[in-house]
Each structure stands twice: as structure tokens, then as C-alpha cells.
């Protein structure tokens, strides 16, 4: 199997948001380790973390799947994640069509506008939802299992897609 890259792009400006990102990153890394153990190669799945304010088009073009994370701010995704899309769209929307994606959105009061925006942006990129997005308000610990499942499912989708390409 060729190396598979899962790109985790997020904006996590608070300890609460950082904790959500850490939960997702740990789950993705654990899933990658399980793949390595079952398939015998520790370098098969790489988890790459990217701050949304520091977009890297080449990194996105090399990704086999993407997990996005943001807070819901004033009814929209974070400006940082919008900046990521603005900075990568022109170069990446055609070459990454069909890319498996999922995301988390955590709001203090409401995530409705951010959910709509995320679906519009990922649809505009022609990405395919690989796992049920985790969109919630309140205490992240109440959604930890969903976050873990989402991350594991995205890793699994990327591995399955890679196996089909063989």
C-alpha cells in the first residue's frame, strides 16, 4: 500500500477547541496505528495537522482524505477556516474532487449557519462526505465518542479507497 495521508485542518483558538482537535487527532492516529498493525507497515497512514490560518496547497493536493474542524462564530465557520478555503480553492478544487471529508463544528449557542456554510464549501470543492459530521453546542465531552468515530471512519474510508486503486 502506498502511504495514505489524512490532513486534519482546524482552527482551535481556545482550550476547549484545542481539546476537540486533540480528541480527533488522537483517534485518527490510533486508527492509523491499527491499520499499520493489521497490514504490517507503520508508515502506511500519516496524520498531518494543519492550522487553518497557514494553508498549504501542496499538502492538500497530496491528501487522501481531509478532516476539518472549526468553532461556530456568529452563525458561520471561523474566519480562519474560511481563509483556508479561500487560499486553496483555485488550485485544489478540481484536482481534489471526490476527496473523502468530514468535520466537526462546535458552537456555544448554535451551529446552523456554520453547518450550512461547511456543506456549501465542501460541496464547492466536490468533496465526498466520508463520515457523519459532528456538529454540536455545549460540552465536547458529551460528543467524544462521535468525534472518535468520525475520525476513525475517515481513516477507514481513505484506506478502503487506496485498496480499490490497487
Model-based region annotation:
Residues 1-3, 96-97:
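Short, flexible coil/linker segments at domain boundaries that flank nucleotide/cofactor-interacting
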Residues 2-32:
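N-terminal beta1-alpha1 ligand-phosphate binding loop
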Residues 34-54:
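A short beta-strand-loop structural module common to alpha/beta enzyme folds
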Residues 15-19, 76, 112-113, 142:
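Residues that form or flank phosphate/diphosphate-binding pockets in enzymes
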Residues 52-128:
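Helix-loop-strand module that forms the ligand-binding subsite of alpha/beta enzymes
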Residues 39, 128-166:
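Glycine-rich phosphate/pyrophosphate-binding loop and the adjoining helix
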Residues 31-41, 92-93, 161-165:
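Alpha-helix termini
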Residues 14-15, 105-110, 136-141:
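Short histidine/acidic/glycine/proline-rich micro-motifs that form metal-
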Amino acid at each position: 500500500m502506498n502511504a495514505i495521508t489524512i490532513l486534519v485542518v482546524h482552527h482551535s483558538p481556545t482550550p476547549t477547541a484545542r481539546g476537540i482537535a486533540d480528541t480527533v487527532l488522537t483517534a485518527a492516529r490510533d486508527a492509523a496505528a491499527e491499520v499499520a498493525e493489521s497490514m504490517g507497515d507503520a508508515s502506511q497512514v500519516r496524520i498531518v495537522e494543519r492550522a487553518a490560518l497557514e494553508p498549504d496547497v501542496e499538502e492538500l493536493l497530496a491528501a487522501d482524505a481531509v478532516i476539518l474542524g472549526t468553532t461556530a462564530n456568529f452563525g458561520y465557520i471561523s474566519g480562519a477556516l474560511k481563509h483556508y478555503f479561500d487560499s486553496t480553492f483555485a488550485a485544489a478544487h478540481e484536482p481534489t474532487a471526490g476527496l473523502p471529508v468530514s468535520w466537526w463544528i462546535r458552537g456555544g449557542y448554535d451551529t446552523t449557519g456554520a453547518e450550512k456554510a461547511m456543506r456549501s464549501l465542501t460541496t464547492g470543492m466536490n468533496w465526498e462526505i466520508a463520515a457523519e459530521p459532528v456538529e454540536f453546542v455545549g460540552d465536547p465531552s458529551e460528543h467524544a465518542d462521535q468525534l472518535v468515530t468520525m475520525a476513525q471512519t475517515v481513516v477507514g474510508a481513505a484506506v478502503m479507497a487506496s485498496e480499490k486503486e490497487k
